[in-house]
Amino acid sequence: MEKLVDIIKNGEKKNIIVLSGAGVSVAAGIPDFRSPSIGLYASLKSMKHLKMRSPTFVFDIDTFVEDPRPFWWIFGRLWPRADWPRPTIFHYFLTLLEKHGILLRCYTQNIDDLESVAGLPHDKLINCHGILSPCHCLDCGEEVSLSYCINAIQPNIKSNIDDYEKAVVPNCPFCNKNHVKPDVTFFGEYLPKAYRKNHKKDFAKCDLLIVCGTSMKVDPVCDLPKLLEPEVPCILINREKVKEKGNKAKQFFDQVKTKFSIGFADYTGIFDFDNKDSFIGGDLQDNCLEIIKRLGWEEEFEELKKQTETIDHPLAKLISDEANE
């Protein structure tokens, strides 16, 4: 932590990239994917009717084309039933980096858009895995409002259906087919245009990478650090170390695991914690707050929270506006 604070205080780095994953939003009440007790995949694995299927099938484009019910079923289970989630300390720390003029970009694997609620400008954010709104029909290509889809799947939301085979799906209002999908990136799809346009030049320009709340197991985002210049340091703020470089025996073992892994995992090491890279372990939010304090940004942090208290979540506002049209 001291290394990161010193780097920021000394003004050494002006083009910081933050790469974030589901772990940064757990404190906002949004489940991550792989935590043993609260992760979304753990919850899916516990459901007997999935019959040993990998939880990732819910977010696979081939599965969606074959049967969109699994996705809209889990979508209904995750959709907020009361208050919308609010930004975490991490999200405010991200905005503070931008306000101090040292954030080049945030590359997030999340689709919750809490960065916007915390005041991060749109041009500083790359949603690697897309966004929830709008939706599009895969059959006719027409744009469909998210509020239309939410209205259509109310039984999934209200009745807490425990079997995806009983889930309802939105039919396209233009062609009446059932392949209406939010603009999120499924496994097997290309990443968004903004990602493809910016990632190579951004990482070539980056002088410090901060990685937060991610297992670094989903391609191609997990390989982004490989685009950095060799001397660029990385700071991993996570509960545990991931993708750590090791000795030759460990590297060989990781490569073997990668070759025979089922799905999308890449186990090969990226972070060199024995040399240029650093690891900050423990609770992510506690660590972000401590970094803010050590930087002397506490007053700015409190003021930023006050300024954003009245900002509605973009999706909440969108649904409300569309419902009133």
Which positions does each model-derived feature cover?
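Conserved catalytic core of sirtuin-type NAD+-dependent deacylases
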Residues: M1-E325
